[in-house]
UniProtKB/Swiss-Prot annotation:
Residue numbers annotated as active site: C56, D63
Alphabetical GO biological process terms: queuosine biosynthetic process; tRNA modification
Protein name per Swiss-Prot or TrEMBL: NADPH-dependent 7-cyano-7-deazaguanine reductase
Leader sequence residues: none
The entry's keywords: Cytoplasm, NADP, Oxidoreductase, Queuosine biosynthesis
Protein's organism: Rhodopseudomonas palustris (strain ATCC BAA-98 / CGA009)
Disulfide bond positions: none
EC nos: 1.7.1.13
Catalysed reactions, as listed in the record: 7-aminomethyl-7-carbaguanine + 2 NADP(+) = 7-cyano-7-deazaguanine + 2 NADPH + 3 H(+)
Name of encoding gene: queF
Amino acid sequence: MSKTPRKSAPSPSLQLGQAVEWPDRPEAAKLDRVPNPQKDTNFLARFTAPEFTSLCPVTGQPDFAHLVIDYVPGPWLLESKSLKLYLASFRNHGAFHEDCTVAIGKRIATEIKPKWLRIGGYWYPRGGIPIDVFWQTGKLPKDVWVPDQGVQPYRGRG
């Protein structure tokens, strides 16, 4: 285990432990990162957001997705409260499924500089067609176990 001393209060630059406003758009959201105490070890971290929402850019109707974000950290870890706020900022954002999914993956990769990152966006049907969107930064590092994302293909009543 790392010998990082426990701090009595979070850094004032982090949103963690602070009362913050919900960002009204993705561009206004801040993604926080914290130092990775295991930066010399390849391991997988996973975030799952089963109730992600955004808006259809044409109709303004809500779209829903189950997002799975896997990454092999480099020097930084993604702080989960800031991720929650960032994802919530899409609630009133109009964009197509593909754009939302890829933009989220690229933004996270830019902020934390992982060794590897992938995102799976499993969008619930609108107009009878589910859309699944996948993006990753490149080749997975060796010796990293990556479990299946665990989201079954959409089947409806069939």
